[in-house]
């Protein structure tokens, strides 16, 4: 009898929820992203890492429909996107809560009318542990609580895909671990998929079913690591330590290449001056 498929194998063989093909993304005459194919299945978490300037946040903006000026295509649930979609919830590094609205109104306001298909704001706030502060203003919350509110806002409307851009980098270590656990619970409970951009390699290995390494100049998928470690994950698992060493080595190679490219550019500019 064959062994049961791993979580990643099951996700990989399913029809992809997200089918992304970026042929080229330009800023002026500079290519930011090139030849980036990405498929993500429901229930899968994909973490994206890479040196600064490699196009990680730009990739998220394209998937979210916030940047449509690129060559390629984005399909979510088999439907081509040409702008923002209620099926994708975006969570930024900063919570970006409207200061004059209560926490409950912030969660409900961001999504707008959705025909009653969304879960109630009260239920979402209870899910992220903020039921007791629903009527408070954002200024009264800690950074971790504000980010919990942002997660609830991202879930409003029952999106199929969560897009998180450095979501936990502005909070302390204990709060970060709690928010990571919350994200894992949310993805499992709602059967969503998630793409997480992070600079933290340990976070990527802890959260991700896959970790993609974007190379700079231009951004391409340079490496892909399948994290075949079952959840709940022990951060001390020796398998994660091996993968971390591989990621660190790949990251350092990419950083060295980026530094060398920058040095050559400066040399050329100096020669032309």
From Swiss-Prot:
Protein's UniProt keywords contain Glycoprotein: no
Top-level taxon of origin: Bacteria
Database matches in Gene3D superfamilies: P-loop containing nucleotide triphosphate hydrolases
SMART domains according to UniProt: AAA
Membrane-spanning ranges: none
Function: Part of the ABC transporter complex SsuABC involved in aliphatic sulfonates import. Responsible for energy coupling to the transport system.
This protein's name: Aliphatic sulfonates import ATP-binding protein SsuB 2
Organism of this sequence: Burkholderia lata (strain ATCC 17760 / DSM 23089 / LMG 22485 / NCIMB 9086 / R18194 / 383)
Taxonomic classification: Bacteria, Pseudomonadati, Pseudomonadota, Betaproteobacteria, Burkholderiales
């Amino acid at each position: 009898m064959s062994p049961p498929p791993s979580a990643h194998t099951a996700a990989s063989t399913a029809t992809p929820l997200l089918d992304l093909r970026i042929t080229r993304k330009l800023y002026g005459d500079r290519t930011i992203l090139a030849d980036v194919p990405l498929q993500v299945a429901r229930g899968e978490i994909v973490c994206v890492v890479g040196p600064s300037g490699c196009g990680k946040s730009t990739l998220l903006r394209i998937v979210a429909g916030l940047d449509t000026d690129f060559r390629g295509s984005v399909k979510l649930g088999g439907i081509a996107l040409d702008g923002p979609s209620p099926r994708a919830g975006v969570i930024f590094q900063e919570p970006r809560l409207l200061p004059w609205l209560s926490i409950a109104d912030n969660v409900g306001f961001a999504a707008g009318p959705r025909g009653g298909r969304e879960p109630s704001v009260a239920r979402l706030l209870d899910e992220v542990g903020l039921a007791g502060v629903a009527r408070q203003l954002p200024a009264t919350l800690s950074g971790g609580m504000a980010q919990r509110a942002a997660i609830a806002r991202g879930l409003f409307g029952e999106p199929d895909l969560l897009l998180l851009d450095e979501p936990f980098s502005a909070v302390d270590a204990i709060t970060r671990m709690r928010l990571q656990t919350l994200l894992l619970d949310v993805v499992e409970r709602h059967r969503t998929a998630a793409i997480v951009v992070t600079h933290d390699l340990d976070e990527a290995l802890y959260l991700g079913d896959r970790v993609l390494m974007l190379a700079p100049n231009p951004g391409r998928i340079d490496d892909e690591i399948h994290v075949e470690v079952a959840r709940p994950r022990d951060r001390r698992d020796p398998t994660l330590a091996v993968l971390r060493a591989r990621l660190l080595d790949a990251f350092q190679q990419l950083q060295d290449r980026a530094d060398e490219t920058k040095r050559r550019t400066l040399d050329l500019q100096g020669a032309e001056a």
